[in-house]
A protein has these predicted regions:
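N-terminal alpha-helical targeting/anchoring segments
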Residues: 1-146, 164
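Low-complexity, intrinsically disordered short segments enriched for Gly/Pro and polybasic residues
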Residues: 70-72, 82, 452-461
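TRNA-recognition modules of translation machinery and tRNA-sensing kinases, especially anticodon-binding
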Residues: 141-452, 457-459
Length: 461
């Protein structure tokens, strides 16, 4: 949510934000009209209240004196004397008009609040102009795509052939766009989750959180996933709860309605959760297999920071996500997203795009965003710089660290072998009992040794 004062005083800046995102500014224009109408109504109500208070005072004096009190000359064109009963009747009419206007005012304020939720964040000056993926800017690349001496297969073929992911039996349980991880596949999935959580907590200093996967409507409004994307959510109608589309929805509300102390910032959290999105997508390589599912696993990073540090913290968050790609040996291109490709909450965002040799595509396993104070205003998360100082809104940042199913798919495609097996990345072997390869008989193991007491098992190769 943007500051209403900013919208009111700098509407052209907000219009430009809509234009940069390739969106119609109709919600802004409607909001400005509603704001003007609200202020007109407030002024009329206050004028009538003042009139009512003044005349009520006159009536009090009149009753106390037992007679009439002078009426201001020329008011309503009437005579100078006004009987008490007539004055009381007039005030009843004024009171009725105030009630009528207050009802209209409440409706206008509700409409203003609804429209304010449709205003996206203002893109940062460094965010490229554009509305399509082709207009994103590649800022750097890491790793060399592997050269195969055979035709690489897409992950869904490899996984089914190895019997480590079962789409058909998942469909028996829940319908299309679900999967069952089995055997070595379930082990690899769990290894990825534990590896990512360990990396972000032990090396990057995040605090692990395990939030609910159900959230109230106001929580998803605060994170920005409602109202725009309500059709994409799994909704429990009986109690108006939603299955979270990402842990960001929960973590953004962790300090809702709190005033934090500056010395506690930044607050950094990481959470693994299943995520649920009822996305509608067309058939194609970018939606097959594990790429777009109604339920998927994700490790999410989230930060509450001071405004002056948020852009630096975005680069740090991005580096934490890139570290996962690098340790797993997955080549990627880093895209700085153009304005039209960002979420409504983001002012600046990066997508590290992993190479999928079997699919023949670069696809993101993560998206890292700086939302400035847009989410914090919705969630009312503030901080004080010092004792007695006026509270300010924090800035919030989020990033996948990473999406587990997509990372699983990227590993399967990048580490596939000609015989149909998949080599396990070295960094994951200690999480898989020392397994170095997934073949058609499951995991193949190597000798595991403990180098030092208390260390994570390492694998001989």
């Amino acid at each position: 949510m943007l500051d209403l004062h900013l919208i009111r005083t700098q509407p052209e800046l907000v219009r430009q934000a809509f234009a940069r995102r390739g969106q119609d500014s109709a919600p802004l224009e409607a909001l400005l009209r509603a704001d003007e109408r609200r202020r007109e109504l407030l002024q009329e109500v206050e004028t009538l209240r003042a009139e009512r208070n003044r005349v009520s005072e006159e009536i009090g004096k009149l009753k106390k004196s037992g007679g009439d009190v002078p009426r201001p000359e020329g008011r309503d064109g009437g005579p100078q004397g006004l009987a008490t009963a007539e004055m009381v009747a007039e005030m009843r009419r004024v009171g009725d008009r105030i009630k009528e206007l207050e009802q209209i005012l409440r409706a206008v304020e509700a409409e203003q609040e609804r429209l304010a939720l449709e205003i996206p964040n203002i893109p940062d000056a460094s965010t490229p102009v554009g509305t399509t993926e082709e207009e994103n800017v590649i800022v750097r690349e890491w790793g060399e795509p592997r050269k195969f001496d055979f035709e690489p297969k897409p992950h869904w073929e490899i996984a089914v052939n190895l019997d480590i992911v079962d789409f058909e039996r998942a469909a028996k349980i829940a319908g299309a766009n679900f999967e069952v991880f089995k055997g070595a596949g379930a082990l690899l999935r769990r290894a990825l989750i534990n590896f990512m959580l360990d990396l972000h907590t032990r090396e990057h200093g995040y605090t692990e959180a395990a939030p609910p996967v159900l959230a109230r409507r106001d929580s998803l409004i605060a994170s920005g996933h409602l109202p725009k994307f309500e059709e994409d959510q799994f909704h429990v109608r009986e109690n108006d709860m939603f299955l979270i589309p990402t842990a960001e929805s929960a973590l953004a509300n962790l300090h809702r309605d709190e005033i934090l102390e500056a010395e506690t910032l930044p607050l950094t959290y990481v959470a693994y959760t299943p995520c649920f999105r009822y996305e509608k997508f067309s058939a194609g390589k970018e939606s097959r297999g594990l790429i777009r599912q109604f339920q998927f696993d994700k490790v999410e990073m989230f930060k509450f920071v001071t405004p002056e540090t948020s852009m630096h913290e975005l680069e740090s968050l991005l580096g934490n996500a890139e570290r996962v790609y690098q340790l797993l040996g997955i080549p990627y291109k880093l895209a700085l997203l153009c304005a039209g490709e960002m979420s409504v909450a983001a002012a600046k965002a990066y997508d590290p795009m992993a190479w999928f040799p079997g699919t023949g595509k670069w696809m993101e396993l993560s998206s890292c965003s700086n939302c400035l104070d847009w989410q914090a205003r919705r969630a009312n998360v503030r901080f004080r710089r010092e004792r007695g100082a006026k509270p300010e809104f924090v800035h919030t940042l989020n990033g996948s660290g990473l999406a587990v199913g997509r990372t699983f798919a990227a590993i399967i495609e990048n580490y596939q072998q000609e015989d149909g097996s998949v080599t396990v990345p070295e960094v994951l072997r200690g999480y898989m009992g020392g397994a170095s390869k997934i073949g058609d008989q499951g995991c193949e193991y190597v000798i595991v040794r403990e180098d030092t007491a208390g260390s994570r098992p390492k694998c001989d190769t």
